[in-house]
Amino acid sequence: MFILLVLVTGVSAFTTPAVVHTGRVSESPVTSEKHPVLGDDCWFRGRDFKSELRLEGEPVVLRCPLVPHSDTSSSSRSLLTWSKSDSSQLIPGDEPRMWVKDDTLWVLPAVQQDSGTYICTFRNASHCEQMSLELKVFKNTEASFPLVSYLQISALSSTGLLVCPDLKEFISSRTDGKIQWYKGSILLDKGNKKFLSAGDPTRLLISNTSMGDAGYYRCVMTFTYEGKEYNITRNIELRVKGITTEPIPVIISPLETIPASLGSRLIVPCKVFLGTGTSSNTIVWWMANSTFISVAYPRGRVTEGLHHQYSENDENYVEVSLIFDPVTKEDLNTDFKCVATNPRSFQSLHTTVKEVSSTFSWGIALAPLSLIILVVGAIWIRRRCKRQAGKTYGLTKLPTDNQDFPSSPNQIKEMK
């Protein structure tokens, strides 16, 4: 019985529910180690590497960088609060221009006095963490455009791609988003063969990029809140570089099939190896049935993560994640493709989502059961062998009990 109890306990240990990985360690934006803030029970994780640079009079959304680490959306008992470093008062307080929505802090419209360090604090029953991020609000003039620009690079004589960044919170359907593109102060004509629509209004293709295409671009979106319209401007500095020796990108993940449970949240990273010791202009994105993700899923159930480039052991990588929130049956019949391209090469890798019907594995359960049967069988055979041995011993001893036969040669007498 003791053996059976141990083996049954082993079965329960083997059949723990499967865990779907929804995050990546390499995506952590924190470079400093955790250290406690003096006089507080919270762990301070440091400052986010990215500063928010915005224009006065426009909407601003600050996203708490702690959320990917703590997953506040998965716990109804978690508490996320905001404060400013120069004030002990929690936000929004009495400020009508500020409010908290899920894991984000909204400021609408922003003014220059909103510049500063903001701290988001995450608490639950077990722990408390803090992280800071910087907001800088500039005067909305052309002189400020270079200060708030996103740097994007295109190779000479290739098809360039401009991306209007950081609009996730403002676009519910990217196919319906109204975005206008400018080069300097000149509105780009949609019929211009030089600048092509990519099907997604947040992206603009540049045909046969030349040195003359370098410069400052603007994408302007109209956002309506409580009946009032606001402009959201993103400035881009495009640099055109001559063709250099580019590494051939190698897509090393994902796998051909990704196991997932229907209704669960799933993150599938596309990891691309870019060689060692060299910079790269490789662009990575996802497609669903040969369609951009933002177009295939206009409501945002499936989205792309940030373009994350990093180094490990002097090896360069870039990752872009495909985020399902949640996984549905539609995804099981969809051909997802990760694409990596640079002036030297074009690579793609297909993957599909496969439903995991149950976290219980009969194969794992039957293995200990088979072991139980073998142990019980071995015990039974051993006992049976003991009984057979006892009977044989009794039979071989019978002749020695007969006194008619002498037991020693000395007892034999000669008959006369």
Swiss-Prot record:
Glycans are attached at N124, N208, N231, N289. Pfam families: ig. A soluble form (sIL1R2) can also be produced by proteolytic cleavage at the cell surface (shedding) involving a metalloproteinase. Keywords: Cell membrane, Disulfide bond, Glycoprotein, Immunoglobulin domain, Membrane, Receptor, Repeat, Secreted, Signal, Transmembrane, Transmembrane helix. Residues 399-416 have a biased composition (Polar residues). Non-signaling receptor for IL1A, IL1B and IL1RN. Reduces IL1B activities. Serves as a decoy receptor by competitive binding to IL1B and preventing its binding to IL1R1. Also modulates cellular response through non-signaling association with IL1RAP after binding to IL1B. IL1R2 (membrane and secreted forms) preferentially binds IL1B and poorly IL1A and IL1RN. The secreted IL1R2 recruits secreted IL1RAP with high affinity; this complex formation may be the dominant mechanism for neutralization of IL1B by secreted/soluble receptors. This is Interleukin-1 receptor type 2. It comes from Rattus norvegicus.
